[in-house]
Amino acid sequence: MKRSKWRTRFAGAYCDPILRSWLTEPDSLTARCQRASSAFRVRLLRYGKGQALADEAVEGKAGRHSAWVREVVLECDGVPVIFAHTTLSTARRGRMTRWMAGLGSRSLGSLLFAYPGFKRGGIEFLRLDRCHPLYRRAAALGAGRKSLWARRSLHRLGGQQVLVTEVFLPAITLLK
């Protein structure tokens, strides 16, 4: 089995300190974005049935499998700062399936951190390059860098798991 490139420790020694603070934020990025801007918005890019990415494992399944896929961009004062990609296995139905379907342009983070039944796993980090599909999707939002930092974590509720990956766009460093 191929070893994951995602790491449980942040190894960005030469990372901008503001970016580092966002990457290692233990609480809700939605709440922090709301505090750091006067106008916060979640823009829904895509939601529907699709395939999990090769490096995503949800419900204990390695590699590509059928999943509900949701992609949004978090905007602060009209500027894209975070691209978020979420997968939920289609193998089981439950509260998460219904909630994800009904979110629309509302933040998933506000649900994950407000509902007491959620259990969050550890945060993993990866510097995405141009070969990674999430880099390409984030770059389409105007991120013209050779690489972008991302983090991901698994959230559990009952028998379901949702994998949330957040890709940090260059404008994030303009926020505190």
UniProtKB/Swiss-Prot annotation:
Question: What pathway is it annotated to?
Answer: Cofactor biosynthesis; ubiquinone biosynthesis
Give me any GO biological process, just one.
pyruvate biosynthetic process
Its main subcellular localisation, reduced to a broad class, is: cytoplasm
List the catalytic activities from the record.
chorismate = 4-hydroxybenzoate + pyruvate
- Identify which top EC class this enzyme belongs to: lyase
Q: Per the similarity annotation, which family is this?
A: Belongs to the UbiC family.
Cellular component GO terms, alphabetical:
cytosol
Q: Where, subcellularly, is it found?
A: Cytoplasm
Keyword Zinc set for record: no
Protein name, UniProt field = Probable chorismate pyruvate-lyase
